[in-house]
Curated annotation (Swiss-Prot):
GO terms for cellular component: cytoplasm. Homodimer. The tRNA molecule binds across the dimer. Its main location: cytoplasm. Pfam families: Seryl_tRNA_N (PF02403), tRNA-synt_2b (PF00587). This is Serine--tRNA ligase. The gene is serS. GO terms for biological process: selenocysteine biosynthetic process; seryl-tRNA aminoacylation. PANTHER family: SERINE--TRNA LIGASE, SERYL-TRNA SYNTHETASE.
Length: 451
């Protein structure tokens, strides 16, 4: 969520920066609600002051023995104030809720270093890394034989999309034998690298979260259609009640679309000691996405699935150091690809292609020879205070005052897409797949997968 104080002080700058993202902020609606909020707040404060003055006046009148009629007249006015104050407080709460609803639909402001642009066509390549020779375009040189895509390579090795479709429908995969082992090896290698070399703390998190958690990280309310909603079977739990014993509404639950949600929420509604920053957290989890807006893209294979595994990196950082942390996290994701000897490039996303909560994002794109193109395998973002403000995540600064942390997240990496990249880049002319050296210890020393 954006800082309401920034909106009040410098609305036009906010509007201009949002416009660079292709977002037209409803200035009229904001001004209407803000004017109403100010008016109601001013009237509330006036009535509160009047209440205090009347209480003092009643005491003075009684103290000097004023006529009863005079005392009663003042008391009558005083007794009418609570109802008026309650109505004003309700109106103020309603207006503030409407303001919050407006702000919750507004994306983060882009950092000054983010290039202007409307779509992915205007993203900027920062660098690329190739483990071998390049062709005339600067892309990895051809393999020297007819390249097959990961589906054709993987199916003889234990990748089964037909069985997955019978079990679950489209956009799922089933793996067995050496293929399942390779998938597991990738995840274990990534976790070991992030924890052992890069200093992240491994976490095991829930795969089901409540709506307030998703609200804090920004998935709700805007991306509700992208989530899998969970319906609980069996008997109900004992109903929760408030302090007065009234039943509370049951909170909706969803499958996580990324463990960014659970890892970032570790600091929800907490105040962290400044000396403890940065926090570096990682987890290997399945991720569940409805792909509601995919429009029939990537229906073949493992590129875009309803269920996929990912090793996530999250940093909770001091605001003064968060952009150093962003570059560090990009390097952590790059190192995975380098050790796997997979060609990749780093792209700085333009204003029109960034995610909802991001102030600055880098995408890592891996080379897929069968598609003759680069495909995203990691996205690393600095959300600054956008998530922290929604979830009330703070730290104590040098003055011992609470201040919002900066939250960062990134894939380190998407396991399924890494498997796709290994199958395509490490395939051999006879249909076998060379196991990258860094994965061989996780494969019991196996160097080649053979049909």
């Amino acid at each position: 969520m954006l800082d309401p104080i920034l909106l009040r002080k410098d609305l036009q700058t906010v509007v201009d920066r949002l416009k660079s993202r292709g977002v037209d902020f409803d200035i009229a609606r904001f001004n209407e609600l803000e004017s109403r909020r100010k008016a109601v707040q001013t009237e509330t404060e006036s009535q509160q002051a009047r209440r205090n003055a009347l209480a003092k006046q009643i005491g003075q009148l009684k103290g000097k023995g004023a006529p009863e009629a005079e005392v009663q007249a003042v008391m009558a006015e005083s007794q009418a104030l609570p109802a008026r104050l309650k109505a004003l407080e309700d109106e103020l709460a309603q207006t503030q809720a409407q303001l919050n609803d407006l702000l919750m639909s507004v994306p983060n402001l882009p950092h000054a270093s983010v290039p202007q642009g409307a779509s992915s066509d205007e993203n900027v390549e920062v660098r690329r890394w190739l483990p071998g020779a390049a062709d005339e375009r600067g892309n990895p040189a051809a393999l020297g034989f007819e390249v097959r895509d990961h589906v054709a390579v993987g199916e003889p090795l234990g990748l089964d999309f037909d069985l997955a479709a019978r079990l679950s429908g489209a956009r799922f995969s089933f793996m067995r034998g050496q293929m399942a082992r390779l998938h597991r090896a990738l995840a274990q290698f990534m976790l070991d690298l992030q924890t052992g070399t890069h200093g992240y703390t491994e976490c095991y998190t829930p795969y089901i979260v409540n709506s307030s958690t998703l609200f804090g990280t920004g998935q709700l309310p805007k991306f509700k259609d992208d989530m899998f909603f969970v319906t609980k079977g069996g008997g109900d739990d004992e109903p929760k009640v408030d302090e007065q014993g009234n039943p509370l509404a049951r909170e909706d639950q969803y499958l996580i679309s990324t463990s960014e949600i659970t890892l970032t929420s570790v600091v929800r509604e907490t105040i962290v000691a400044g000396a403890d920053l940065p926090l570096r957290l990682t987890a290997h989890t399945p991720c569940f996405r409805s792909e509601a807006g995919s429009g029939g893209r990537d229906t073949r294979g493992m590129i875009r699935q309803h269920q996929f595994d990912k090793v996530e990196m999250v940093q909770i950082a001091h605001p003064e150091h968060s952009y150093e942390a962003l570059e560090e996290m990009v390097g952590h994701a790059e190192r995975v690809l380098q050790l796997l000897e997979l060609p990749y490039r780093v792209m700085l996303l333009c204003t029109g292609d960034m995610g909802f909560g991001s102030a600055k994002t880098y995408d890592l794109e891996v080379w897929l020879p069968a598609q003759d193109t680069w495909r995203e395998i990691s996205s690393v973002s600095n959300c600054e205070t956008f998530q922290a403000r929604r979830m009330q995540a703070r730290f104590r600064n040098a003055q011992n005052k609470p201040e919002y942390v900066h939250t960062l997240n990134g894939s380190g990496l998407a396991v399924g897409r890494a498997l796709v990249a290994v199958l395509e880049n490490c395939q051999q002319a006879d249909g076998s797949v060379r196991v990258p050296a860094v994965l061989q210890p996780y494969m019991g020393g196996l160097t080649v997968l053979e049909p």
